[in-house]
Amino acid sequence: FPLVALGGITPSNAPSFLRLGFRRVASLGYLQGLQLSELAEAVRTFCQPRLLLCGGIDPTSEAGITADARHAERLGVRCYTILTAITRQDSEAFHGLMPLPDAEIVGQLEALRRQDPPAAAKIGLVSSLHQVGLIASCIRRLFPLCQILWDPILRTSSGYQVLEEGDRAEIDRAISAVDLL
């Protein structure tokens, strides 16, 4: 539904309208009551895009969700991060990874339910095709308007296989769970 309000919608209650399924909210009355010095920050808060990043953490911060979040925030995007795995690597070699259990990943996503909803989500490093579907279904349940991108990481540049090979049906299920590959 489109929702336009001339009063009553503030930065603190706008997310609740978005969680109810409204595509947009407007708050002219709130902005009108601000001092000129407060206006720029208020507009930025209302208009700042939100991105959900799901992936592994790289100790060097050269890859993974740390690098993704750093780049997105430089562009003015507010990021939420969901950890899927802890990697052991340096700038020269990949030494392994420890995937987080499904329940931990879902728990992290559930903890974000009261945040402003993300417009888009990026799924990066996962340890299984099953995790792609699990993460996507949880995102769709919590944030139904969120567009989901899967950027599959099959193996590292040094040849370490990150994502197990699946059969055709598993691959099709994972791909159909997301909006963009």
Describe the residue ranges of each PLM region.
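Short secondary-structure boundary segments
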Residues: 7-9, 29-30, 83-84, 125, ...
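Glycine-rich beta-to-alpha transition loops that act as phosphate-gripper elements at the mouths
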Residues: 1-12
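Small-residue (G/A/S/T)-rich helix-start motifs and N-terminal tracts that mark the onset
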Residues: 46-120
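Short catalytic-loop micro-motif centered on adjacent basic/acidic residues
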Residues: 4-5, 120-124
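Conserved beta-alpha-beta core of the PfkB/ribokinase-like small-molecule kinase fold
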Residues: 123, 128-181
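Glycine-rich phosphate-binding active-site loops on the catalytic face of alpha/beta enzymes
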Residues: 14-46, 80-88
